[in-house]
């Protein structure tokens, strides 16, 4: 624009009454757009002449208003013969005027003038006709009633946007989120204004004094550091939320007063978590606070639900799941029940291995037929899960595991079915079976072969060893030795009998989960120090286990008081610290970006180990010995659909293989660097990491991998276990992506919640992604199994992998999927989700 040297200093009154400096560039740009919109070319000289005429005529106008400027532009264009451009400019003005009118009408009806700016941003960001605010106004007015308060009208406006969400107009869920966020922020600002608090430090001081925030945050950070952290906040990232995600976060994740009033914003929540996770960093602590905050607030990484909920709070139990080995003794069983109760009290889920507990009819102190079997004890576990309900929020959650050769297996497989003796049922636990390779081999080659069920206590008594302590060929040799020993009582059935019970229960109840014990232990990077008997509640954890053992009970006298001291050997009580990469929100093709993101997530998870509040000392000791973590993924189907990759395609298989190899490489690289900085885990020597067997078993033979293996051998590893893919049912909603590694259930559906219907939309649903979102029950499950097998090579632990079947599936077809998974090296199978079956989701492992 050539007339800048002749700038006229004036003020213009905006429509809201505010006076601001007049910017003639805006007139120039508006006219230029009008000419461009009509496909008309205009020389710079003529444009300057038009602008000069407009400015000259405006210079005598007092006061100068927006409408007066636009009137003068129209008049000048017509005087110079540009009628079509002037007409287009007039129509454009009318359209803008209509947009303003609908905004003002909605804001006035709600009674909130500040809403106008939110609506203006919505109009700018959602320009398609299907997202017209006129439709929102019409729906909103149908909800309005006489006597409604301003808050009720704001809630009705949000509800209107929610109900406009359809498969054809999915972005209304983002508009609804903005409206919800505006209402929340207005109320939140009023809450803090009423308390006389105006900055982040003041908020943290108040929350700490009220016992809602852990005092350790302000003890570790100075006032200046908190002020620096406040500058990291990016409120605009709230616009990444869908309505479902923001609604869930405000109801369950942000800190609330004791009267259930939310007291922190979503961004303050992410920052609070980051402050906690970086608390003990020695160097560049504020830099790590920012990196942790950025990965969380950009929704590129989600921490597990306990970490998201409890970080920054006084009781900061950050771990998701725990796994206990139940001993075969009265004291041991009740200790395990007590452990479960304490874990459940603080929101953790539990896996319990019952494979060492003697079967029904076994001996007790030599008395024949005295043992009641595992079912009676599992019923106590069931009642504990119901009784310890986390302050009335939700009941405890536990998976109980039993070996496929245990004599109580037939009754165990009917724990949750609807027929049979109710005294032998436990409907609130999740049964899971530990299968040896021999079982699947017989199911594939000779399903009518005999299968012998035995009591582990009887084997230990007769043979002097515990059969469950072995795996692979050594287990097979000892199993056959027991089968051929007439001193050991057998309950002989066929493989087909067990398969039939397993599949019937799976189709009817979704369980038992499957744990392929030989595959797990063969690929265990820490097999030099122990064995893995079972997995956790959600079947993604595979870590060394050992039962807690009673050593002695002694009586002492101290200061005249009698003290009873019980000594125990802590065993290996498994702990899961989880987080997930949101693959749908990440540039997975960008190797450098992925490596940096994985490095940040690994460091955050490692910090959880030292910062955690442990409900049990056994858990703390095991976690600090192995320093195990579980980095997983969510948004798997989201990632594929965004890239135009069909689930049922070879391209899917090749892509997932490449992505998970990249994730694993980045994780190992980050972890060994962390070991160099902070020290290796205690049992590194002799592990597959140290010997190189970890890399050999997975076929990592490229130059890049060989170089990394050498580095690991020298530097060590910070964490004994690295990767585990959890279900992420809740946190995937927060981050607006698909759950875990599952395909979506439907492109669009309505979920009934507290009397209203909430729309659920596939992530980033559009005409570009529509045909790549195939519903889970319509997918050929063999593609899912093959993909799981490829991923499993790169995952040192396991995956929460579901099978989706319809009523058309035969038992033989379901068995074929189990066999295919076993052959592919898949370590675990979570639910078998029949289309007609509702199954419960694990919130503890949601990451």
List where the protein language model places each region.
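Internal maturation/activation junctions in enzymes
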Residues: 295, 313, 337, 597-620, ...
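Terminal amphipathic helices with adjacent charged low-complexity linkers/tails
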Residues: 88-95, 102, 172-204, 435, ...
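Alpha-helix capping and helix-loop boundary segments enriched in small/acidic/polar residues
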Residues: 18-22, 42-45, 110, 261-264, ...
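Catalytic alpha/beta core of large soluble enzyme barrels
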Residues: 222-234, 238-247, 539-543, 605, ...
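Conserved, charged catalytic cores of large soluble enzymes
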Residues: 189-283, 366-380, 392-396, 401-536, ...
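Function-dense linear segments that define catalytic or interfacial modules
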Residues: 255, 261, 270-285, 289, ...
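Core nucleic-acid recognition elements
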Residues: 2-8, 18, 44-271, 287-293
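Short, surface-exposed, low-complexity cationic segments
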Residues: 23-41, 115-129, 271-278, 739-744
